[in-house]
Amino acid sequence: MTPTISPAVETKNVLDHLEPKEVLGLFEVLANIPRGSGNESKAADWVVAYATELGLEAKKDALSCVLVKKPGQGGLENAAPLILHGHLDMVCEKAEGVDFDFINDPIKLRSEEHTSELQSH
């Protein structure tokens, strides 16, 4: 489920032929949000909006750290909580002579049929 949030994130559907489609679709949305270290606020906003669309409790703090809560289900409603941790920022580095603005430009994904790797260019 790709969220319909504002501001909308434009994707080129580069990964549509790969599986799992839903996960890679979300990855493509996130790749289109510039998020170098110290510039992850828009990515954090997107995660909060997506979680909220899914009916989850979500909030972002002043440092763009995001907390999403999902209640237990299937008989585990009273189980101890589970915490998963990750990060939204990227370590931004480019080859000499490459013109790319990590503050404003989305990552351009490409998929090559002869490899299972995802590459950016």
Language-model region placement:
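Flexible, glycine/proline-enriched loop segments at strand-loop-helix junctions
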Residues: I33, S37, S116
